[in-house]
Amino acid sequence: MRNYETLFILNPSLDEEATKAAIEKFKGVIEKEGGVVENVDEWGRRKLAYPINKVNEGYYTLINFKANPELPRELERVFRITDGVMRFMVVNPEK
């Protein structure tokens, strides 16, 4: 298993319950595919460097996890089809 981290930005118009549900959904995808979530760091609402779809703020969350090399592709697919995700990135911090 390799170490990965994902940082994603959720639309700030989501209420707190929807934000928590989205984070749990992504953690569930990682665990369902055989990964292990090591740390979830919610940075909260922050100003974006530039507007995305006329939105100036976003809800940032960082998840560190261990997984097989196939899992990041599935996680990215889920990010793309989930409403409310403005930006995301999955990286291997060792490289």
UniProtKB/Swiss-Prot annotation:
Keywords: Ribonucleoprotein, Ribosomal protein, RNA-binding, rRNA-binding
Pfam family, one: Ribosomal_S6
Cellular component terms per the entry's GO annotation: cytoplasm; ribonucleoprotein complex; ribosome
GO molecular function, one term: structural constituent of ribosome
Transmembrane segments: none
Gene3D superfamilies given in the database record: 3.30.70.60
GO biological process: translation
Annotated SUPFAM superfamilies: Ribosomal protein S6
Listed InterPro entries: Ribosomal_bS6, Ribosomal_bS6_sf, Ribosomal_S6_plastid/chlpt, Transl_elong_EF1B/ribsomal_bS6
The UniProt record lists the keyword Protein transport: no
Family: Belongs to the bacterial ribosomal protein bS6 family.
Function (record text): Binds together with bS18 to 16S ribosomal RNA.
UniProt cross-references to HAMAP family, sorted A to Z: Ribosomal_bS6
Protein name: Small ribosomal subunit protein bS6
Recorded name of the encoding gene: rpsF
